[in-house]
């Protein structure tokens, strides 16, 4: 299955004249249009063979999608599009064939912006810069994961995040044409076919949902064959290709956004058969000042297994160290002693360990979803945001209750946005200012949902929260706060402070660091007047 590229200018011709001869989208053959001049051999009809892997087409024929997708073997830096992509390392200084070409055409201004402004990009994330001398307006930078067979689940998930985050950023910026490079191309250990399936599947799901975007997948001559063979599985151009895909598509066809859906055994706790260690109690788990909690095992196997954080630092040592290694030994011990009586203390160690792992895995799944899903319907409300720092330099999170439409919003997406905003902040101390000003019953979520949110958030959220200010509380607010912190969240009860006015907040947060809507200050002046409180800096 060969894509006709006669209408595409040769790569070497562009290499010498990229700045003077930009390639317009109209000069490229779309995937749907390539069928007219395609010289493929007849496709094998699998209908007479055994049963297909799928009963119905997961990726049905769609001419509109095919006409917004291009596979192109050419120099990406010559494309006159809204954005192109660059794949690099976390310092954004890696030298590979893709980045070198982009830097050569864009000029030194791009390097300067990366070194002075952007500085770094985590694996799976995306950073944006201007295109400078490139025909493209912007460059979207991302970092592909390293591939290890032991951690293939994490690598595949993170590569999906790379593609998904780049595409979502393009949509967020209202970019209509984007050129994607083969993001995993410089990771030689990443299986080419696996990477191609992830890329094509993610692009197809994106184009299904975003009907105004055009995606150009730029591949090298050595990669083109793989993508042209696999593309009909996700972008069928006729009924025969669609029917053949039922047999040829892998069982894992991804989730709603193309994310890998791994079988259950990959997500289960690994039990070794010959454990050599005994059970040791970890007394610091009960210490509230510790950075480690049964519900907060950052940097251990959960990160490694699911790719939510740095994938370049994977090592067997980090995987088997710390709390996770201790819990693993406990579980191994349980496996061997399953038929023997156990003490209550030992059972508690096991149950807490399993519960902690499951809790962390759940949070990591939500975090991955928060990083890839479109949350503009929540972020656009403006009810939750970061506003400067307090007098001790801690980030201040502002929540405006009046602007939170609890009865008319997808509360699951609200939770995802909360996680997306707070996850990079809660690694250190932080404070929250909740403004109850002029709220109504339509702004009150159920206590069940609040309890669910509190239980989902890891230990670091509670430990590093140093103050929770409630401004303009009502009698109802005070009663519900007392009940919630007494029976559901006693760990934060001493950190909650009810303040009758905004000026009381200035004791902890200077006025220039607090950005709040005008309706709050207007209500405060109408209720309390002016200069009703002389703030004295505190170290709350």
From Swiss-Prot:
Q: Which Gene3D superfamilies match?
A: CRAL-TRIO lipid binding domain (3.40.525.10), Leucine Aminopeptidase, subunit E, domain 1 (3.40.220.10)
Q: Which residues form the Macro domain?
A: 56-235
Name the source organism. Drosophila melanogaster
Q: What happens when the gene is disrupted?
A: Shortened lifespan, impaired locomotor behavior, and increased sensitivity to deleterious effects of stressors such as reactive oxygen species and nutrient deprivation. Locomotor anomalies include righting defects, reduced and uncoordinated walking behavior, and compromised flight.
Q: Which residues form the signal peptide?
A: none
Q: Which Pfam family would be a valid example here?
A: CRAL_TRIO_2
**The protein's name in its UniProt record:** Protein GDAP2 homolog
What InterPro entries does the entry give?
CRAL-TRIO_dom, CRAL-TRIO_dom_sf, Macro_dom, Macro_dom-like, Macro_GDAP2
